[in-house]
Amino acid sequence: MLPLLQLVPAKLLNSSCSLEKTLQCSCSFHGIPTPSVQWWMGGVPVGVDGMDGSLQVTSTMLGPWANSTISLTEEPEMGMRLLCEGKNQNGTHALSILLMSRKSSLAAQAFVKGLIQGAIYAGIVIALLFLCLLPLIVKHIRKKQAKKAAAIRAKKSSKVRASQELEMSLKPEEPGKPVVATFSESRILEKQDKRAS
């Protein structure tokens, strides 16, 4: 009597993609009974061991192993999905691959590179502009500070004069105290005394 083989659902054990002249993707499934492999491109099944202009599928089965490779000779459309599906009566296992155009990745890289260069150049221009304007900014600030200082000095001197005048007006004159005057002032005082008498 032969021992019963244990049934094993299809399971993806290995997958890879490489890009040289063409894009090649491979899937390896294991299961008992041996899984069948089906490729799907953009939701449409691709024939096994067949050629479809831009697609070529090659599959091999050995014992519980099923290996399949798909080759794309033309560049895929942006965002196209490639699906590798292995199934047997006990289960299904699949791998979805999102295909990107080589041109689109280069365009994105060029955009990012340009964006970084633009940011660096903008930083340099701003720094140079600041360095050129720095003397004008300093001159403007010093002018403002000088005006403020002059206004404060003028305010202080007017307060000092006002307080001195206030002190002089409040100070009583002492009778009989000699008044010291210059020669010209004393002549004016003498003339005033003569007129008064």
From Swiss-Prot:
Compositional bias per record (Basic and acidic residues), positions renumbered to this chain: 162-176
Subcellular location: Membrane
Full protein name: SIGLEC family-like protein 1
Transmembrane portions of the chain: 118-138
A GO CC term assigned to this protein in UniProt: membrane
PANTHER family xref list: SIALIC ACID BINDING IMMUNOGLOBULIN-LIKE LECTIN (PTHR12035), SIALIC ACID-BINDING IG-LIKE LECTIN 5 (PTHR12035:SF125)
Membrane topology: Single-pass membrane protein
Phylogenetic classification of the source organism: Eukaryota, Metazoa, Chordata, Craniata, Vertebrata
Region (Disordered): 160-179
Keywords: Membrane, Transmembrane, Transmembrane helix
Taxonomy, superkingdom: Eukaryota
Record organism: Homo sapiens
Gene name per UniProt: SIGLECL1
